[in-house]
């Protein structure tokens, strides 16, 4: 008979086929004993837990009635509900609720549907004492609770509830602030202890936190042993730096992190001296460091604001330039290319200036030839001239410099030069001539009084004396500088007297609308016209065209090629730009040479010139436009149909110019200079007869006046009687001077200009608010018999 070993019974007898081993039997026996002991321990633990639970349940409760009420909250609520129902005269409801909730009644109160409370079951709790209120404590409690709940949830509430809620919030904020400052002070104290800088000072957390935040308060620590200077010894094994994240102060030096070492501690435990002793470049994480603006240094990379004088990353001799803080450097696209300028060179360093003074002769000539760049007009962009460097076949945009070397000869000139520097323009006052509109205010008038040397060699004159910077294909910073010598293929005329037109235009916005005048005789130059102060005899102020902050742009009439000039009509075709008269045979040497005396050749050629037209259109969107025209000893043709020219007031002749609807215009009621037959206006916006205006004693324009003052070279007024005329009281306009009715009889003979180049003062004609239309601006057609180069001084659009 064989026995089968069962794994579930290890103590079973093994079969006879298998050898019996005493060691295996012992192991099985020990495991059985361990299991038995474990089961007994588990039973004992369970019994102990049950006993503890029974003891907790069987513990005697507190004999205090208040404690019983708190432990039995539901019964208390039921009692208050029963009290509320009783005081609300709901007796049947209260009796039914008391019966269902098993509530006892008062001793003196008999139940409605049952015996007294003594006969009730003993398990029911006795009726506890309820706060006696007229309408029931539950109702009053609920009323207060609901009022405060509405106040806290922004649903209204009574005034007292709102005041109470604000007081509670204020107390909570103060506690929160004090708690946060105490935590902050504890962190700082802990950090000081770890660094060995704390000597068991009694510190108020509020004072310490305020002190570390930089607020001026009373000293938080009472100094002990002031005369002693203990050396702080860091604790061994502890890190020196702080690892806590203190409130978010911006670190002035982000490269210094947790590896920075704290500076030497102050002599005592006063924390007021720790913050200021820190270096800006060395920060300890955890100390409040404010981000003050750092001073620029030479190691300042791109991106940090730095003064131009502190760094010089250029590879050439170019010295740093201080640009204005509120203005950007003008790009070549921001400037027109049809404006000449006077000679000026960019600033050079001391070494280059010394070399330029020492070297002369052939070496200097060769250097000038090598550095000369031919400036050509761009094919598509009228505002960005292109330069062609010697040896290259590509044209690159020219970068126009704005460095001034010339020094004017008066304080007024210095002021104007400083204004030109602010706008980033070049000096145009060092070699320019005077203008009749700038007499007494322009430095060019003072400079023109000095005797100038006659230049015999025209090759020495330079019309492209502005520095240009070209960028090659490899991206190098090579600078090509135009010297004072003109290119060999450039022809420059030495005519001193050339009329010019100054238009106040925005160079950036009206770049594409600028008159594309590309010169094939002289190179274009960039300059800025000086700010002039001219007497405005009209009641409306003057506003620049297009831009209110940029200087006027001066353009010579001779810098226009034949491609843009119509010889038949004498007009210039420009896209949405101003149209100006042109004389392609006359070149300009300076934009301010409009008032120089006429030479003998110009005097002889007065009768040989073809009449030209000046068609001026104001910019789109201007509600008020003023046209200031300055003429000198010229003839005005009021219309093409009128062939009889009328002289300006020379020798007693009276200026007669009529303003009205132009018969040549097909644009509606746009008023221009018209024939003398149109004398009666048909609307408020139409023109008036100037002759009738001069001979009248009152103003015809509602808000305007006409002023014409003809003076002799001796600055004596030929007008016998000038009366002051004021405008309407509704408009705050300045009073103007209007000639009286006898102006025609009191005009004396005026000295005419001869070959001796006598100074002849200009005659000012100002037309204001002529033919204004609501949607589109007017067109002004001014026909000039171009018999003198200096007749047409300038046209200034202000609107």
Swiss-Prot record:
InterPro entries: LisH. Residues 41-55, 307-317, 341-353 have a biased composition (Low complexity). Residues 37-68, 101-127, 255-406, 431-502, 568-623, 644-691, 705-758 are annotated as: Disordered. Keywords: Activator, Nucleus, Transcription, Transcription regulation. Residues 270-285, 318-340, 371-396, 460-480, 584-593, 660-675 have a biased composition (Polar residues). Residues 73-105 form the LisH domain. GO terms for biological process: regulation of biosynthetic process. It is found in: Nucleus. It comes from the Eukaryota. One of its GO terms (cellular component) is nucleus. Residues 354-370, 482-497 have a biased composition (Basic residues). Required for diploid filamentous growth, haploid invasive growth and flocculation. Putative transcriptional activator of FLO1. PANTHER family: LISH DOMAIN-CONTAINING PROTEIN, TRANSCRIPTION ACTIVATOR MSS11. Belongs to the FLO8 family. This is Transcriptional activator FLO8.
């Amino acid at each position: 008979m064989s026995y089968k070993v069962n794994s579930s019974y290890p103590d079973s007898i093994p079969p006879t086929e298998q050898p019996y081993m005493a060691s295996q039997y012992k192991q099985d026996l020990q495991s059985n004993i361990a299991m038995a002991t474990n089961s007994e321990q588990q039973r004992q633990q369970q019994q102990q837990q049950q006993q503890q639970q029974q003891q907790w349940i069987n513990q005697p409760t507190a004999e205090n009635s208040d404690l019983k009420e708190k432990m039995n909250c539901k019964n208390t609520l039921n009692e208050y509900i029963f009290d509320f129902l009783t005081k609300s005269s709901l007796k049947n409801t209260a009796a039914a609720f008391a019966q269902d909730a098993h509530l006892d009644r008062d001793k003196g109160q008999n139940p409605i549907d049952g015996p007294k409370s003594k006969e009730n079951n003993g398990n029911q709790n006795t009726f506890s004492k309820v706060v006696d209120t007229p309408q029931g404590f539950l109702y009053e409690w609920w009323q207060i609770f609901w009022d405060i709940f509405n106040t806290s949830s922004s649903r209204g509430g009574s005034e007292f509830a709102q005041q109470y809620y604000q007081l509670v919030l204020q107390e909570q904020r103060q506690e929160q602030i004090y708690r946060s400052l105490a935590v902050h002070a504890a962190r700082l104290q802990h950090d000081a202890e770890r660094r060995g800088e704390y000597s068991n000072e009694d510190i108020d957390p509020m004072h310490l936190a305020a002190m570390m935040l930089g607020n001026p308060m009373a000293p938080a620590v009472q100094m002990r042993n002031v005369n002693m200077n203990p050396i702080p010894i860091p604790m061994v094994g502890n890190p020196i730096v702080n690892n806590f994240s203190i409130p978010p102060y911006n670190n002035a030096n982000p490269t210094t992190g947790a590896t920075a070492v704290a500076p030497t501690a102050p002599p005592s435990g006063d924390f007021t001296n720790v913050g200021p002793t820190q270096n800006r470049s060395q920060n300890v994480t955890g100390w409040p460091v404010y981000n003050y603006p750092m001073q620029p240094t030479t190691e300042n990379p791109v991106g940090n604001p730095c003064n131009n004088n502190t760094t010089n990353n250029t590879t050439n001799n170019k010295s740093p330039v201080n640009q204005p803080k509120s203005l950007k450097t003008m790009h070549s696209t921001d400037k027109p290319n049809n404006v000449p300028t006077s000679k000026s060179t960019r600033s050079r360093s001391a070494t280059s200036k010394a070399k330029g003074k020492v070297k002369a002769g052939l070496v200097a000539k060769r250097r000038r030839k090598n550095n000369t760049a031919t400036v050509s007009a761009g094919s598509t962009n009228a505002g960005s001239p292109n330069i062609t460097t010697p040896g290259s076949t590509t044209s690159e945009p020219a970068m126009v410099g704005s460095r001034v070397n010339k020094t004017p000869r008066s304080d007024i000139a210095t002021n104007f030069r400083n204004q030109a520097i602010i706008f980033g323009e070049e000096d145009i006052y060092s070699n320019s001539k005077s203008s009749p509109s700038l007499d007494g205010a322009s430095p060019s008038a003072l400079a023109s009084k000095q005797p100038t040397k006659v230049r015999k060699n025209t090759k020495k004159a330079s019309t492209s004396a502005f520095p240009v910077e070209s960028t090659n294909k490899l991206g190098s910073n090579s600078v090509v500088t135009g010297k004072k010598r003109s290119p060999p293929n450039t022809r420059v005329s030495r005519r001193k007297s050339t009329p010019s037109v100054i238009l106040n235009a925005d160079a950036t916005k009206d770049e594409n609308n600028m008159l594309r005048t590309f010169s094939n005789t002289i190179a274009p130059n960039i300059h800025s016209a000086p700010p002039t102060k001219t007497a405005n005899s009209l009641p409306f102020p003057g506003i620049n065209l297009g831009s209110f902050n940029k200087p006027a742009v001066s353009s010579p009439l001779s810098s226009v090629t034949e491609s843009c000039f119509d010889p038949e009509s004498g007009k210039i075709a420009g896209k949405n730009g101003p149209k100006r008269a042109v004389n392609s045979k006359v070149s300009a040497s300076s934009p301010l040479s409009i008032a120089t005396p006429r030479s003998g050749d110009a005097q002889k050629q007065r009768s040989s010139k073809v009449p030209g037209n000046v068609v001026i259109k104001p910019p789109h969107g201007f509600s008020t436009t003023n046209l200031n025209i300055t003429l000198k000893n010229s003839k005005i043709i009021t219309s093409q149909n009128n062939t009889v020219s009328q002289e300006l007031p020379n020798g007693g002749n009276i200026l007669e110019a009529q303003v009205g609807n132009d018969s040549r215009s097909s644009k509606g009621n746009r008023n221009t200079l018209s024939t003398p037959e149109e004398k009666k206006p048909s609307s408020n916006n139409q023109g008036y007869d100037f002759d009738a205006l001069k001979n009248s004693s009152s103003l015809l324009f509602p808000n305007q006046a006409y002023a014409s003052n003809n003076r002799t070279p001796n600055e004596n007024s030929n007008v016998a009687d000038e009366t002051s005329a004021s405008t309407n009281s509704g408009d705050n306009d300045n009073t103007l001077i209007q000639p009286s009715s006898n102006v025609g009889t009191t005009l004396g003979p005026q000295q005419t200009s001869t070959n001796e180049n006598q100074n002849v003062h200009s005659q000012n004609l100002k037309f204001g608010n002529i033919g204004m239309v609501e949607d589109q601006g007017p067109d002004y057609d001014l026909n000039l018999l171009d018999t003198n180069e200096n007749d047409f001084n300038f046209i200034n659009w202000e609107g």
